[in-house]
C-alpha cells in the first residue's frame, strides 16, 4: 500500500494484492487520482492463479517474511517465490525485503520484530512462529531453490522500513559511517554495547553483509544484460525542507567507473 503511488508514477500499470479490506480502501482512497492501479482483496494464494498479466517487477516488501501464513505448505517461502516467479514477464525481477535474523541490532538488544522478544531469531525460531526473518545464507538458499539463479543483495541502513542509506556489494559502508543506530521507534530495547564501534570492527573484518540489519534482494530467473549504469549506493537527505531534500546516488558502469547523481526528493526541489 505505501509503495503503490510511487510505483504508479514509474510504471504503466500496478496490481496490488491485500488481505485486509480496510487497507485496500485506504490504498484506493490515497491513489484515487492515479490511473493504471488494480487492487485485489483476499488471500494471495487464491488470487495469484487468476492474475492474467505477466509482470516486469514483483515486490514482496515485508510479505516474504510472512510466507508461512501466505502459503501454508511444506516449503512455504520457496513456494511463495515459485508462485511469484510464474507471474514474471521475460526478464522480470522480484524484489523482496527481509530483516536479517543475525542483524547486529538483535545482538545489541533490539527485540525481534515479529515475536517481540529478545534473541528469538538468533537462538532459532520455534515451529509456532508464523513470521520469521532470514540470514543471508538462508535467503540465498531459498531463492535458488525457487529457481531464481541470479540475485543482487542491497543493504538498507538502519533497516528497510526507514532507510536513510542503501549499500550494495559493490559499495559497502566505510568505517565511521554507521552511527545512526537508535531508530527503533516501535519497541523498547536494551543497549548492550556501542553498535557504532561494533559496526566499525565488522566493516574492518569484511563481515558487514553478514551482520547488516536488513536485506533488499533483486532476483531473476537468469541474469539479463546489465544496464549501462547501475545504482550501487543511495543516500537520502530528506530531513530538510522539501526544497532542499535530495537523494544522492552512486552509479557504476560495466567498466567499474563510478558516477554521482543527485535527485530532488520533492517537486519543490526541481524548480
Regions found by a protein language model. Give the residues of each.
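Short alpha-helix
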Residues: 128-155
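C-terminal lobe and adjacent flexible extensions of AdoMet/dcAdoMet transferase-like proteins
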Residues: 166-270
